[in-house]
Amino acid sequence: MVSIRNFHEQDARQLQQLKYQYKSIEEIKEIINLWNEKAYNGSYYEMFAVCDQDEIVGSVSLYKHSDYIISAGPEIYMPYRKKGYGYEALMLAYDYAKDLGYKIASAQIRTDNVASMRLHEKLGFQRDCEMINRKGKSVYIYLKQL
């Protein structure tokens, strides 16, 4: 069964194997502690472990854009991709955001990222517009009412 939860310092070794091979356990624990502060640049931000049973298969973050708009960013680690974890992680993250009072989910997806577009459409998102992001890349904005 897939679930999301906050990261714990005990997750550092598993994160080192899956994502942060070139960081020490202490550096990874510092990253986890920063995530658990639930803020980034003065806005609400929360990072969750995506778990299948007790095994971490990825992460998903929530980022506040306004009092009513939030976005989520999933990262499923390489050995676990293409198994439906991204869909489950986003469903759980957006359910959590709805419980917190958010009304709209927003996603910025590169125009060449067909897999992400399909995933968001499967989740009920609709394409709203196209724009150039801060990195100079063409992206679509997808929106969904929570």
Task: Describe each model-derived feature in a short phrase.
Residues 99-109:
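Conserved GNAT acetyl-CoA-binding A-motif
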Residues 77-79, 83, 111-112:
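Active-site acidic-Proline motif in GNAT/NAT acetyltransferases
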Residues 64-74, 81, 101-103, 133-138:
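A conserved beta-turn-beta hairpin within the catalytic core of GNAT-like acetyltransferases
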Residues 1-15:
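A short beta-loop-alpha structural element at the N-terminal edge
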Residues 14-17, 30, 34, 88, ...:
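Alpha-helical elements of Rossmann-like donor-binding domains used by nucleotide-donor carbohydrate transfer enzymes
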Residues 6, 10, 21-73, 77-79, ...:
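Acetyl-CoA-dependent GNAT
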Residues 82-96, 118-122:
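Conserved acetyl-CoA-binding loop-helix of GNAT-fold acetyltransferases
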Residues 108-109, 124-141:
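Conserved catalytic-core motifs of GNAT/GCN5-like acyltransferases
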